[in-house]
Amino acid sequence: MTEQETLALLEVKRSDSPEKSSPQALVPNGRQPEGEGGAESPGAESLRVGSSAGSPTAIEGAEDGLDSTVSEAATLPWGTGPQPSAPFPDPPGWRDIEPEPPESEPLTKLEELPEDDANLLPEKAARAFVPIDLQCIERQPQEDLIVRCEAGEGECRTFMPPRVTHPDPTERKWAEAVVRPPGCSCGGCGSCGDREWLRAVASVGAALILFPCLLYGAYAFLPFDVPRLPTMSSRLIYTLRCGVFATFPIVLGILVYGLSLLCFSALRPFGEPRREVEIHRRYVAQSVQLFILYFFNLAVLSTYLPQDTLKLLPLLTGLFAVSRLIYWLTFAVGRSFRGFGYGLTFLPLLSMLMWNLYYMFVVEPERMLTATESRLDYPDHARSASDYRPRPWG
């Protein structure tokens, strides 16, 4: 730009700054802004005077630069508002307009909150923090489960969450494993339970049939005799000595139970029980209980048996030991026919109890609570016991 163009621009800026009272619109190239009375602005007159001395090309370049400068000056921020020296004129008829009442602005969040909560975080900062609801952490009580009954079928169903009602394939397998016991292929219809019940009953029935047969066969065909035991004390001592052999399966079970505790690292007394350890523990506990009941009745039976039938004492002792070993084996395998081994122990115990009660109340009631010798061991009393049976009614 030449010196004349620079001077023209400075004069335009000086003249526009005090006279601008409203934002000016953009003026296209080649047009001049018109005033209210149609008179041109003094800045434009000076521009024309200054540019008339130059060449035509310079005049056209000056006009283009002036138009672009005026358009840029109209968009500047300091020219958009009214200047304090030139107040904005009031529009005509503004006094006829009634002022509208000011709308009540809604209270902000900080104004609505009480004074105690005035030190809360701002809204934007509070979005970064997620409040913790204790009700979401606590487990829902059992009373919250919704139980509905279908009107048609009349069956009550407990509605569970959708994740439980439609489990994943892995969860479905676990659910089926819990509902259906291992080795059950009936699909949960209940036929496997009936089969297990039938097997248990059949095994106990087989023990009921074989128990007297085994006892009679051993009594008749085993070649050994019992020594002469005329006194009650000698019979009790003989019975207790026979009971030592019956403790063999119990002691063996205790040893295996201790080894299982060491092998499976289940030394914690209140830890989670394991199947390999619980099998032997239950066997030992049950065997000790049956041993006490079995030999208590066997000792009482030895005081009532005649001399010829004292051979039953060692036979019943051996039957107890064998039956306990059979039960232990079948219980460890997990078969339902373990009732056979249990029946070989419980049925002789029940038979001895019935025999003792029969002798105490029917055959020899006078010796129920005394320690006298049995009259069945003497030759003169070798006759039938019915000849000497006292009647309670006389």
UniProtKB/Swiss-Prot annotation:
GO terms for cellular component: lysosomal membrane; trans-Golgi network membrane. It is a multi-pass membrane protein. The gene is TMEM79. The keyword Membrane applies. It comes from Homo sapiens. It comes from the Eukaryota. Changing V147M: May be associated with atopic dermatitis. This is Transmembrane protein 79. Keywords: Golgi apparatus, Lysosome, Membrane, Transmembrane, Transmembrane helix. Residues 225-243, 304-312, 364-394 are extracellular. Its main location: other.
